[in-house]
Amino acid sequence: MKWFPSLLLMGALSMGACQGQTAESSSTTTTEAAASFQNIQVAGAQTMINSGEHILIDVRTPGEFTEAHIDGATMIDINGSDFESGMAALDKSKSYVVICRSGGRSARASQYMIDHGFTKVTNVEGGMNAWLASGYPSVAGQ
């Protein structure tokens, strides 16, 4: 019977140690969930682009980019062999607006950026399709 109080004490300490790990794991999960990109409609994107405080990244193919793109955009083709090196060359402390044709590829590229340490990333919902349908300006060629 002398061992019973010792057993209770060891059990209580073990439970306390496990409880601390759970709290730490929850904190890590919350931090990871907080790291995400923002979505914005084209009107908001135009405001951001015109402010001059954000860098516009177009992740479409060279053919799509040549057909029509937003003036000042930097093309980094998400399906191109130089996508990762193009992203690695960007300054992670800057703010980025990412666009594609319809919003799917730019969402993937935005998540890639977040996963690789970028913190200020905004995806344009609807992409160039929505941009052009709204009558916002574009340019052709490289």
Question: Where are the regions that the model predicts?
Answer:
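Short hydrophobic beta-strand that contains or immediately precedes a catalytic carboxylate
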Residues: 45, 55-60
